[in-house]
């Protein structure tokens, strides 16, 4: 939504001074989108976090306190959160990447209907909701979402998180939207593919994006392929549906 507002035709002709503060969720908020929106409206835009199973919010950056760009902020009142090992489930210290789990009065007690009991048991343990999101907490208690567990790209022995690559792509001001996915190979490994929507009336090339990634990323994190699209598939709340991008790739190979 914020990207759409930033890019709306004649948006500067509208009176936007009534916008004082907004919160973004549902998908990672690119820093470039945040900065453009705040410059446009003179209001505050902060990133938060939540999920349907948490009714639906657990974290937010303070609107007028310490805001850390690129993070989801701190847990809201009466909510606990921590990072646990992706394999063992053991608590991890600050600075270590693992799975975000949350606990509080807003957490669901389960899914409606007995057919979902096994699914609920897999993500609810001792009152903690296992979010399926890979994250890290800093020394100030601010959390940063790295990736969905299922979206993490395994290339050789390395883990690549889509957001890290997408943030680099957004450094090119000709990029309107970007989404990065892992494309499966016959040997079980994945290659990194980026889908990019260029800004209208620009001369964006794949070569300049690859060159940018090579300057800013480790070699194993550089996309092996970039595909330009007019639009990216999204849910009704504006979240990019990565699975549809990978399904398109699979269909094309059949």
Residue ranges and their predicted role:
Residues 1-2, 29, 107:
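Alpha-helix capping/helix-boundary segments
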Residues 6-67, 80:
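Gly/Ser/Thr-rich phosphate-binding loop
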Residues 10, 18, 42, 78, ...:
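Glycine-centered tight turns that cap/initiate beta-strands
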Residues 26, 50, 73, 133, ...:
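Active-site glycine-centered loops adjacent to acidic/histidine catalytic or metal-binding residues
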Residues 46-53, 73-75, 181-184, 227:
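Beta-strand->loop->alpha-helix junctions that form or flank phosphate-binding loops
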Residues 74-78, 90-122, 158-160:
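Conserved ATP/PPi-binding loop(s) of AMP-dependent carboxylate-activating enzymes
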Residues 104, 109-110, 118, 132-221, ...:
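AMP-binding/adenylate-forming catalytic core of the ANL superfamily
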Residues 248-254:
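Acidic/polar alpha-helix N-cap and adjacent early helical turns
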């Amino acid at each position: 939504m914020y990207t759409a507002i930033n890019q709306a035709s004649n948006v500067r002709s509208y009176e936007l001074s009534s916008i004082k503060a907004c919160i973004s969720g549902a998908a990672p908020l690119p820093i470039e989108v945040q900065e453009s929106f705040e410059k446009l409206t003179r209001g505050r835009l902060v990133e938060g976090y939540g999920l349907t199973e948490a009714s639906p919010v657990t974290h937010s950056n303070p609107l007028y306190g310490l805001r850390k760009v690129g993070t989801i902020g701190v847990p809201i009142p009466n909510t606990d959160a921590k990072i646990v090992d992706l394999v063992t489930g053991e608590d991890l210290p600050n600075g270590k990447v693992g799975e975000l789990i949350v606990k509080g009065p807003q957490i669901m007690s389960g899914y409606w209907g007995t057919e979902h009991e096994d699914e609920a048991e897999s993500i609810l343990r001792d009152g903690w909701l296992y979010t399926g999101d890979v994250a890290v907490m800093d020394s100030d208690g601010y959390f940063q979402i790295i990736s969905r567990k299922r979206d993490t790209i395994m290339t050789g022995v390395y883990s690549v998180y889509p957001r890290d690559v997408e943030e680099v792509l957004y450094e090119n001001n000709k990029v309107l939207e970007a989404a990065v996915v892992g494309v499966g190979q016959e040997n079980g490994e994945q290659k990194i593919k980026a889908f990019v929507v260029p800004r209208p009336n620009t001369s964006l090339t794949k070569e300049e994006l690859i060159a940018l990634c090579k300057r800013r990323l480790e070699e194993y994190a550089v996309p092996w392929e970039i595909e330009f699209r007019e639009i990216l598939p999204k849910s009704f709340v504006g979240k990019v549906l990565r699975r549809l991008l990978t399904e398109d790739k699979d269909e094309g190979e059949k």
